């Protein structure tokens, strides 16, 4: 089957922003103007297309990255609407991994918010080109120029306005197009009747000033244009657009647009900018992967190359288990067998679908550059690579942050117990930052996630979708343990008691690894002193032992283990014996290697009226917080701090009472840090007391 849309006319884009910047409304308007939906949905009415979960429609926030296809000017645009709440960082992270470009939506009143910085950093991590849409220009306090300065100062981005607003707040009535040097005046409520006219006289000077800045920015992308500019020649519209596209894709320019999605202003011009400036799959560097022997390879966006696709999301659905994939090269066909190279398992694609709003359309194939969902995959999870069996490759997976908060879940009846295990399995398949474990001491089921809202929504889904009745415990901090010095240790497991004995023996070197590494294992066994079939069980034994540390029973992370020596017995050695030997060795090593307790530190941003600044800072310091910065602007003080999560429970209530209900704060996970000795001793004593 031939490709219906040429690859250069495909755009895979995300819409990302701070919560409440108007992201979902912007997506709805894009779908309305491009003809996918015929009635505009409103977030505050709970009728939007991309917010499909009940919790999303009730709370007016987008939780899961919904993927939708539409078209504009003969281009196919695949859109992922990402959540703006910090507890759903994984949704933003996984969508950034499979996108080619991003529309970053900012509120013209709020400007650059803490979550905007997080989303921007995630886009930086994957080098995703972006354009900025300054939304809500009709709101009281709207200021396009303030947002422009904040993006340049706080995000260190080369934001270049290609539009200016005509009027603001309730006087916002149109847009100056700096590329064409024309004005667009909106004549009706639906924003479909637009008058193309001269720039208003009172704005010509300002428009000229920003036009010059635009020309200077694009001239820097190309020596020939720079020469033309210095010689005083006018650049043509085509030259400006081509240079803007080149700069945007290279990440050296971020075009800025403005509008009011809710009032239907500026959305068609935003769609034009997506087509004009954001990259097609062939405009971005080829995806990198590894062959089974570790060699690095590239796969270009080309239907004729071998298949390489990344699973970026799992969703349970009336249809069955949907695995969302991005095809980077080759063609994924319905009914075909593919290799999950990450797991080394063969899988069958029973059906393929693409989403158009909340309609699912079955297709026979997905080609290079396409986004869609596959049914029938049983072993494939987020971050896994699907490829041709004859040409295996493993693509770089996603960055999955450690959960920071946990609660115990107790089913109310035996029937609930069965429903709970089914619900937890499905939810953890969908969301890799949601972890489930069973406490070996208490036999309690413990769920962990990225924040209180994250767990609240997951518990809500268990109750609604899976009809589980359960008691939920108090939130607990997800502490971790690690080591501080390199050591050598050995583990021997020998049993002789008549008949076949047991024999396993390993020698390991253990050293601290980079934060975020988790557990890293390397074998340097030579000459078969430990047969290769016994190395994976030994590694497994070590991994399992690290799930419960020696200080307080928390998982041990960020260590590198090298298997350097060992011995075996022709008759008595077995996989189980080496698994136990591995476990003994790692426990001895951790005990000798200066183990320490780690706690999650949160990046906290607080905004309060200036008169409460002293109270709020004193309170943060009392919570073991480290103040990192403070600013005061228009009577509003902003404080940035790093604070242990353990001291942030109930902060929402405290800040309200400390500021007469006028303070707001946001919090996201920053990193794990060593717990001060006096605090650590209390935690360890408490855990040993419970054991």
Swiss-Prot record:
Residues 8-282 form the tr-type G domain. This is Elongation factor G. NCBIfam families: EF-G, PRK12740.1-3, PRK12740.1-5, PRK13351.1-1, small_GTP. InterPro entries: EFG_II, EFG_III, EFG_III/V, EFG_IV, EFG_V, EFG_V-like, EFTu-like_2, G_TR_CS. Catalyzes the GTP-dependent ribosomal translocation step during translation elongation. During this step, the ribosome changes from the pre-translocational (PRE) to the post-translocational (POST) state as the newly formed A-site-bound peptidyl-tRNA and P-site-bound deacylated tRNA move to the P and E sites, respectively. Catalyzes the coordinated movement of the two tRNA molecules, the mRNA and conformational changes in the ribosome. CDD domains: EF-G, EFG_III, EFG_mtEFG1_IV, EFG_mtEFG_C, EFG_mtEFG_II. Keywords: Cytoplasm, Elongation factor, GTP-binding, Nucleotide-binding, Protein biosynthesis. One of its GO terms (molecular function) is GTPase activity. Belongs to the TRAFAC class translation factor GTPase superfamily. Classic translation factor GTPase family. EF-G/EF-2 subfamily. It is found in: Cytoplasm. GTP binds at residues 17-24, 81-85, 135-138. PROSITE patterns: G_TR_1, G_TR_2. GO terms for biological process: ribosome disassembly. Its main location: cytoplasm.
């Amino acid at each position: 089957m031939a490709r219906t849309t040429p690859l250069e006319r495909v755009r895979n884009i995300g819409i990302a922003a701070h919560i409440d910047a108007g992201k979902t409304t912007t997506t709805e308007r894009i779908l309305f103007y491009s003809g996918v939906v015929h009635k505009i949905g409103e977030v505050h009415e709970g009728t939007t297309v991309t917010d499909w979960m009940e919790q999303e429609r009730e709370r007016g926030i987008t939780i899961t990255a919904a993927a939708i296809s539409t078209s504009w000017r003969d281009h196919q645009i695949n859109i992922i609407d990402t959540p703006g709440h910090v507890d759903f960082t994984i949704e933003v992270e996984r969508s950034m991994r499979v996108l080619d470009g991003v529309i970053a939506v900012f509120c013209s009143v709020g400007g650059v918010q803490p979550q905007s910085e997080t989303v921007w950093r995630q886009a930086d991590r994957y080098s995703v080109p972006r354009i900025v849409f300054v939304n809500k220009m009709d709101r009281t306090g709207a200021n396009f120029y303030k947002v422009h300065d904040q993006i340049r100062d706080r995000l260190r981005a080369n934001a270049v306005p290609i539009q200016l607003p005509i009027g603001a707040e309730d006087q916002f009535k149109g847009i100056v197009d700096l590329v064409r040097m024309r004005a667009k005046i909106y004549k009706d409520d639906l924003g479909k009747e637009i008058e193309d006219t001269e720039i208003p006289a009172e704005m010509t000077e300002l428009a000229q000033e920003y036009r010059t800045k635009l020309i200077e920015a694009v001239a820097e992308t190309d020596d020939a244009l720079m020469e033309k500019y210095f010689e005083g020649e006018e650049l043509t519209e085509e030259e400006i657009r081509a240079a803007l596209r080149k700069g945007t894709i290279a990440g050296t320019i971020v075009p800025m647009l403005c509008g009011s999605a809710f009032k239907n202003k500026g959305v068609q011009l935003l769609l034009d900018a997506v087509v004009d400036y954001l990259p097609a799959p062939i405009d971005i560097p080829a995806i990198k992967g590894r062959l089974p022997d570790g060699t690095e390879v590239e796969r270009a966006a080309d239907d004729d190359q071998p298949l390489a696709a990344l699973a970026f999301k799992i969703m349970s659905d009336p249809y069955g288990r949907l695995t969302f994939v991005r095809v980077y090269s080759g063609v994924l066909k319905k009914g075909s067998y593919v290799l999950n190279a990450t797991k080394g398992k063969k899988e069958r694609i029973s059906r393929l679908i693409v989403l158009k709003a909340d309609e699912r359309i079955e297709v026979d194939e997905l080609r290079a550059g396409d986004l869609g969902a596959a049914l029938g995959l049983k072993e494939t999870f987020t971050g896994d690579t699907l490829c041709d069996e004859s040409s295996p490759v493993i693509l770089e997976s996603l960055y999955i942050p450690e959960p920071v908060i946990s609660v115990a879940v107790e089913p109310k009846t035996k029937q609930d117990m069965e429903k709970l295990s089914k619900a937890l399995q499905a939810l953890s398949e969908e969301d890799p930052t949601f972890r489930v474990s069973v406490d070996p001491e208490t036999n309690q089921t413990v769920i962990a996630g990225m924040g209180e809202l994250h767990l609240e929504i997951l518990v809500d889904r268990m109750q609604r979708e899976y009809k589980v009745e359960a008691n939920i415990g108090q939130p607990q901090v997800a502490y971790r343990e690690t080591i501080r010095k390199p050591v050598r240790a050995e583990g021997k497991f020998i049993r002789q008691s008549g008949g076949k004995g047991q024999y396993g023996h390993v020698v390991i070197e253990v050293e601290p690894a980079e934060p975020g590494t988790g557990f890293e294992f390397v074998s340097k066994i030579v000459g078969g002193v430990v047969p290769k079939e016994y190395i994976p069980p030994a590694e497994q034994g070590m991994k399992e032992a690290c799930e419960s540390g020696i200080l307080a029973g928390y998982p041990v992370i960020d260590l590198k283990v090298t298997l350097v020596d060992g011995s075996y017995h022709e008759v008595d050695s077995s996989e189980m014996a080496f698994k136990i030997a591995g476990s003994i060795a790692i426990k001895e090593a951790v005990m000798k290697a200066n183990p320490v307790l780690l706690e999650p530190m949160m990046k906290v941003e607080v905004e309060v009226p200036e008169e409460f600044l002293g109270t709020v800072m004193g309170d943060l310091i009392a919570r073991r917080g480290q103040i990192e910065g403070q600013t005061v602007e228009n009577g509003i003080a902003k404080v940035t701090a790093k604070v242990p999560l353990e001291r942030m429970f109930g902060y929402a209530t405290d800040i309200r009472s400390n500021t007469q209900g006028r303070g707001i704060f946001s919090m996201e996970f920053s990193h794990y840090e060593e717990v001060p000795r006096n605090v650590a001793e209390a935690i360890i004593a408490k855990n040993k007391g419970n054991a």
